[in-house]
Amino acid sequence: MAGSSYAQEVLIHAAKVAPDKSGVLVSVTRTQARWDTINFSVRRLIAGQYWQSDTRDEEAAVVLLGGRATVNWGHGYREIGARRDVFSGYPYAVYLPCHTPLEISALTTCEFADARVPSSARLTPRIIEPPDCREEIRGGGNCTRQIVDVIRPEFPAEKLLICEVYTPSGNWSSYPPHKHDVHNPPKEVDLDETYYYRISQPEGYAFQRLYDHAGTRDDTLTLVDGDLVLIKDGYHPVVAAHGYNVYYLNVLAGSARSMAASDDPRYAHLRNSGLERDPRVPLVRAEPTERSA
C-alpha cells in the first residue's frame, strides 16, 4: 500500500536497467526530496567503464555495494571491493571532503551508492575498509537485526552518517518505532534519512510503516529490491517478508552528527524485551563469503 500523496512523494522505485547494462539505478536530489540535506544515487558500471565527478561544495561518501573498482581522488588511488553483493560481506567505502575530484573505474561489474550533503569543511579523504566498520547486534527474538556502521558520529566528517542494516527473514528492524525529527539533544536530533533496499531474492519484499507523532499520517509501503525511501519525520519501522533477508543502506544528515532518536512511547518497553537473539544473526561477516567477487 502506497496510495497516499505522502507515500508517493517519499517512495522512489529503481530504474529499469538490465542486469548487464550500466546506468543510474536510483537517484534523488535535494530539490526532488524537498529537503536541504542529502543527494543520493546508486550507479552500476560494467568492467572497463569509469565514472568521473567532483564533490564541489559537498562532502561525499561512496559505498561499494558489490564488485571491485579502483578509485582516484586526485592525490590518492586505491583498489577497493571484495564482496559480490551486499549479502556477501562488509563494505568498502570512500569518504571525500568538498572540492575533491573523483574517478571510479570498474574492474568487475560493480554497483555503488553515492551520498552527498552540503559542506565547507576541508577534511581528509579516507578509505573505509571492512575491518574499519563496526558491527552491532540489536534486539532479540524476531526483532534481532545486524547493524554495520560505516561512518559513525566520531568519524572525521562534517555531516554524513552511514550504516548498513541486515534484517533476517520474518524479523523486524528500526524497532521499537523511533523518530528523529526534533533537535532536542542528547535525547533526539533532527535527521533526514534514506533507506535504500536490497532483497536477498528478486521476488522478495519488505513493509515499512510511516506514521507521525500526532496520528495525522499513517502509511504502509511495500518495498522491493532497489527501492529508496526518504524519511523526513515520524516513525518508520520495517519488517522483512518470510523467506527473504532484507538489507538497507541508511544515510543520515541533519542538525547534529548524532544518532539520537526517541522511541514511540507506546512501544518503548519492547526495547529491552529480554528475548534471546536470533541465531541467524549476524547475516554477514567482515570477511567476504563464497558469494563474494
Give the role of each language-model region.
Residues 1-53, 269-279, 284-293:
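Generic N-terminal segment detector
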Residues 110-150, 209-211, 249-293:
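Double-stranded beta-helix
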Residues 87-107, 222-243:
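Conserved metal-binding segment of the jelly-roll/cupin
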